[in-house]
Design a protein with these regions (language model features):
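Transmembrane beta-strand segments of outer-membrane beta-barrel domains in Gram-negative
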Residues: 122-126, 132-145, 154-160, 179
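Transmembrane beta-strand segments that form the barrel wall of outer-membrane beta-barrel proteins
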Residues: 1-3, 10-25, 29-33, 45-53, ...
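Short, charged beta->alpha transition segments
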Residues: 3-6, 85-87
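Outer-membrane beta-barrel strand-turn architecture
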Residues: 11-13, 37-41, 90-96, 143-149, ...
């Protein structure tokens, strides 16, 4: 997916505010606070606390992602999504990072929206609101090759809440990217993201007894990653 780096505002050396004002502020108001909890040499521990309100985006996409419900009393309800996480990073030049994050959807009234059964990035984005829960574990590495070139990679694991019809709640992913410094204030990121997940896909295969039968298989999708970062 083409992505846009969030706006980061340093309040103090240990406190940072993060939001996506261009893409999300009007559609899904969001804010994350990152607080450095401890520094021990090259080790840093950071707490991450956020909240978002995805209802505007969900209502805007009625007729595409969700039913319009023009002739019924069904509706996309108000849903608040708080999140909490912790990140542990180590290293000065090559940085290793581990992150654990949990988000939950809190309905503020009646809601009829159901899980989308769609592409993995969209499923994971709205999982707290539509399934009630999303947890995420990430292991990553960031290494500079040249003064103007950095490489980074990650392994990811997600678990979301239950949905109907029943499917596996487990998502696996990985990413690799190169950050190219194009000027003193700009960076271009090029890479790819892969997802392994259950989308109710089936294939007809021949069993050991010679009979043909349908078997559930997981989807594996690869998405390009393009990002442009501007720093003031």
């Amino acid at each position: 997916p083409i992505s846009f780096d969030p706006l980061r505002v340093g309040v103090t050396p240990d406190v940072e505010l993060v939001t996506h004002p261009v893409l999300d502020l009007l559609l899904s108001p969001n804010l994350e606070v990152r607080v450095v909890l401890a520094r021990l040499g090259a080790l840093r521990i950071t707490g991450e606390y956020g909240v978002s309100l995805p209802t505007f985006a969900m209502r805007l996409t009625q007729g595409y992602l969700f039913p319009t419900w023009k002739t019924s009393d069904n509706r996309v309800g108000w849903i608040l999504v708080p999140s909490s996480g912790i990140a542990v990073s180590y290293g000065e030049r090559t940085v290793l990072t581990g992150r654990l994050e949990v988000a939950a959807g809190i309905p503020l009234g009646h809601n009829d929206a159901k899980p989308l059964d769609s592409w993995a990035p969209l499923e994971l984005l709205l999982a707290p609101a539509l399934t009630g829960f999303r947890s995420h574990v990430m292991l990553g590495v960031d290494h500079p090759f040249l003064p103007w070139l950095r490489g980074r990679a990650s392994l990811d694991f997600w678990r979301i809440g239950p949905s109907e019809p029943t499917r596996s709640p487990l998502f696996f992913g990985g990413s690799a990217a190169l950050d190219l410094k194009t000027s003193e204030r700009t960076t271009l990121t090029l890479g790819a993201v892969v997802y392994d997940y259950d989308q109710h896909r089936t294939e007809v295969v021949r069993g050991d007894d010679g009979r043909w039968q349908r078997k559930r298989v997981r989807n594996v999708d690869v998405w390009p990653m393009i990002d442009f970062v501007y720093r003031r």
